[in-house]
Amino acid sequence: MKKFIILLSLLILLPLTAASKPLIPIMKTLFTDVTGTVPDAEEIAHKAELFRQQTGIAPFIVVLPDINNEASLRQNGKAMLAHASSSLSDVKGSVLLLFTTREPRLIMITNGQVESGLDDKHLGLLIENHTLAYLNADLWYQGINNALAVLQAQILKQSTPPLTYYPHPGQQHENAPPGSTNTLGFIAWAATFILFSRIFYYTTRFIYALKFAVAMTIANMGYQALCLYIDNSFAITRISPLWAGLIGVCTFIAALLLTSKR
């Protein structure tokens, strides 16, 4: 009898517990990712803050695995947004951009004076159509940035921007030759230039310039390999012979012009 009463109590309390669970996490900041899917969260939060300053609308971006009750979310979303934005100053409205990762999609809810000319559902579909290709390819950073750009254009009554690739902060120089963006690289090459100029000084002018150029070319390739090794990304294919060759040619010309001997 006692076990039956306990079981009955659990059956009664479980639905109440499930009902009390919030639909989405409390939005304490402009960007919330409970899945850990989106890289560079700080950069996206910064973009959201810029969006708020430029439009007067606070964008709350939330990334969840899935949403269980979309109807309830749309019904209570405005109240959630009002509560989340109550601590923010100089905002005339707020918008929720809810991204789901299990089945990539976007749900959008607005609150306040968000003047876009479209209702929430149609505005959300417009933004989703411009970002879904990125989301399906797991390019969440790109998708969220494009979503903010399209939404901002709608609010400010501007033309819809084209799809844009937004490089991650760490990808600004990803196509540059290894070590070429390192400040210490200039110091290393200056020291190498001085060293080789003394080593090859006691030869004829042409041989001096040729040896100097070959040595600087080989040293550059070694320097690239060292930078890749330190960065734990060493691969022969990532070493740029073109950059090394350019260093060699420039060295050869400089040696011919700066050397006064025959």
Curated annotation (Swiss-Prot):
Pfam families, sorted: TPM_phosphatase (PF04536)
Record bears the keyword Transcription: no
Membrane topology: Multi-pass membrane protein
Keyword flag Cell inner membrane: yes
Transmembrane segments: 5-27, 183-202, 207-229, 239-258
Gene source species: Escherichia coli (strain K12)
Subcellular locations according to the entry: Cell inner membrane
Cytoplasmic side: 1-4, 203-206, 259-262
Alphabetically ordered keywords of this record: Cell inner membrane, Cell membrane, Membrane, Transmembrane, Transmembrane helix
Side Periplasmic, residues: 28-182, 230-238
Any one annotated GO CC term: plasma membrane
Protein name: Inner membrane protein YcfZ
